[in-house]
Amino acid sequence: MTSRPPSVDSLARSLAHIGLPHPLLVDAARQAIAAGNPDLAEHIANDIAQCLLVPVINAAGVIAHTNLGRSPVAHSQSARAQNLEFDLRTGQRGSRQAGIGQLVARACGAESAMVVNNNAAAVMLVLAALAHGRDVAVSRGESVEIGGGFRVPEVMEQSGARLLDVGTTNRTRLADYRKAIDKKSTDVALVLKVHPSNYRVEGFVEETLVDQLSTLGVTVVSDIGSGLLDAACPWLSDGPPSWLNGEPAAKQTLAAGADLVTFSGDKLMGGPQSGFIVGRRDLVDACAAHPLARALRPAA
């Protein structure tokens, strides 16, 4: 005599100890019964539970391991309406960029600043606003891949800019950039310098620094990655720690001659996931006016 399978409801209730919401337990029960093996229900429910977010201890820190979430942020702001995009002085529409932009620009010694939802978005917005349909010179040694398989050439392609490879993987000189810019077949809108934060080339190497690039007569954009605001770390009584040696900082990169600097706000800055564009006011304004800026703006 063939035994009847348990009801979906009774099987789902027997899985309550797993701690999933009841509708998910019902789904697991239905899948197991449909497969002809009710005993599979607990295995299916446990698989679902493994997909949920749980608290962990990130002993490596957000700089070394962002896959365990960004910096913990204590939300103490009361839940109430705020003047997010409203100018209380004029009674007119305001900008959500105004407050944070002024603060970050001041910290970096920049004319202006804006925030988007991550650093890849910051780079893409800069390229779309300033180099769409034109060439962007990048050293072959800086055409990097960041986490999740996202690559600089692919971000550039989506922006509508054209990648112009310069130099070699291990050695790129100022003369290489100048040669690429001076070619009659190229239309270089800007030079993009990318800090290779997740790898290092050592040995027979040569790098062109920002102060050298600033002599080329084209816009220089530097993506410094992790978001060190000031190499002097004036907020630390003992000065910058030794492990920051070699890490580019926004303030010093701008002082060296970069027109724009992009970086993350969720690593060294310790904020929520975000990306910043800082530098010349006219260039930041051009980025802010681009249609992509609204799509890439951070949530309220």
Language model features: what each stretch is:
Residues 53, 65-70, 89-93, 112-115:
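Short secondary-structure transition/capping motifs
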Residues 29-30, 59-60, 69-91:
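Glycine-rich phosphate-binding segment of PLP-dependent enzymes
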Residues 92-300:
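Conserved PLP-enzyme active-site core in the AAT-like
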Residues 5-6, 57-61, 270-272:
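Short Gly/Ser/Thr- and Asp/Glu-enriched loop/turn motifs at secondary-structure junctions
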Residues 30, 34, 62, 268:
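Glycine-rich phosphate/diphosphate-binding loops and the adjacent beta-loop-alpha structural elements
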Residues 37-73:
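Glycine-rich, N-terminal phosphate-binding loop and its surrounding beta-alpha-beta segment
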Residues 63-67, 85-87, 137-139, 262:
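Short glycine-rich or small-residue beta-strand-to-loop segments that form or flank ligand, phosphate
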Residues 1-47:
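Long amphipathic alpha-helical segments
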